[in-house]
C-alpha cells in the first residue's frame, strides 16, 4: 500500500497478496526447522463442486488458529486434503453426468469418477485459496489417491490380523436408494407423518387387533408378541395367529419386551422392520421371511415390484376392502433415514465387514477424556454418542467407487486371503488368486470401504507426505459438530486400535451457519454462496463475519455483518493512509526517548497481545 491510493480495492489487494504468499512460500512447513511444531489435522472437505458458506465459516475459524500459532513463533504444519472417495463422490458424479453407477460397468464408472474429479478439484481447491486459508497446499492428499488407498488398505489388514475386523451375515442397516449397507453414524432421525392402523389378525374365530405403521411388512410377519402379565391376551399365548391378507399362521409368544401401553399392547414381529425385530427373531429362533429386494421393492405375490410406500398404500387399500382395518389415526414419529439421500432405512440380511467396537465403549470414553475440548460442552456430545452405540462399525459399502477391501475369499472352503502389503494399493476384483489352503479359486471382494475408513486416518496420511516428521498426537483437530459421531469418533477409534494413542491433544468444534435462524438447504432455497459474498464484499469481510461467533455456536448469516467488515477494511485503509501521509521524513531509527503517547500505545498493544495470547 502506498500513500497515493485514494480508495481500497479489496479484490486487487487480495489477489496481489495471494500471489505473494504463493511465490514466497509463506505458509510452507519447514521440516528442517528446530522450532516447536504445531500440527493441525485439517478437515479434507468433501469434493462437491464448490465451497459452501459453512466451509467458509469453519475454515476461517481454524485458519485464525494457524496464523496465531505462526505469529507465536511455532512451525505450523497445516496440510490440505480433499475427501473424494465413496458414496458422496458417487452421488456427485451421478448428478453431474446424469448416470447411475448400478447401471454401468464397475470399471467404466470408476474411470468416469476419476476423470470428473480431475476436472473439478482444482477449481474446488481454489475457493479455499481465495478465502485466504493459509494451508501448505504442497502437502496435499486426496482420499482416493494411491497413497491414501494404500494406507487405508494397510489399516484394514492390520486390524484384521489383530482380530478386530470380521465378516458377518445378518440384518444390517440398508439404504434402498443407494443400495448399500450403512453405519449407525450415517443415520439421521427425521420426524415424519404416518398412519397408525389397527388391523384384524385371527386366532381361531376370535379377532386379535394389532396396530402398526408398516402394513407392508405383513408378508414378513413371523410372530406376534404379548406381555406375559397382560391379562387381556393370556388366553392367546401359545396359539397361532392368522396374518390378514396373507393367511399364513404365526406363533403368539409371551415376551416381556411387548409394551402393554403402546397401541393394542400386541405387536407383530417381522423380518425385519427394525433392530428390535432382528433381536426378537434371533432370540426366539424364528424362521425369517424376506420380502424386500435390495432396491426396496417387494418380491411377494400381488405386490411384486412395488416400492415400499406404494406397497404400503396398496396393502392398506386391500385390507380396507376386506374390512380388516378397525381404526386409523394420523401420527408423527421419528424415522431412521440415510444422511446422504434422506431415504428411510430398512433392515436387510446381507454379508458385511465390521470393526468390533461395542466391547470398547469404556476405552473410547477414556480416550475422549484425555483430549482438551473447545468448547468443553462438545465433549458431552461425544460421550453421548459413544454410550449410545448399538452396532459395531459397518465398514463395507456395496458400491463401485471407493477404496477396495483388500481380500479374496475361497469359493470352496471360504478361506479369507488378505493382500500382502507389497501389493497395496490393490483392487482384488481385478486380480485372480488361488486359495493357499485348498488351491481352489479365490474370488476378489467387490465391496469398497466406508469413506470414513480412509478419512479416519487423516493424521497418518498427512504425516506420510513429509516422511512422518509429524506424528500423533497432533496439536489440533478443527471440525464442525455434526461429524463428532463420524470423523472425530472414527479417527479416535483408529488411533486407539492401531497405536493406543489419542490422535490430537485439542479438538476445536465450530457451529453451523443459519439464515434467519434456520439451517440452510438447497430444497428451502436459502443457500448463500460464499463465492458471491467474497466477490461483493471481499474475503476479509467474510472472515471478519466468521470471527463473530464463539466456538461451537451457530452463526446467523446477516448482510449487515459483511457491510460492517467492509467498513472495517476501509477504516484500516484510511488509518494507514493517514500514517503514510505523516511519515515522509521518517527514518526508521529507534528514538532515544519515547513520547508519552507512544508509550501509551505500546502499553495498550502489549496488554492486548498478552490478553489474546493467554485467552
Model-flagged regions — what are they?
Residues 54-67, 74, 82-83, 148-151, ...:
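Structured ligand/cofactor/substrate-binding pocket environments in proteins
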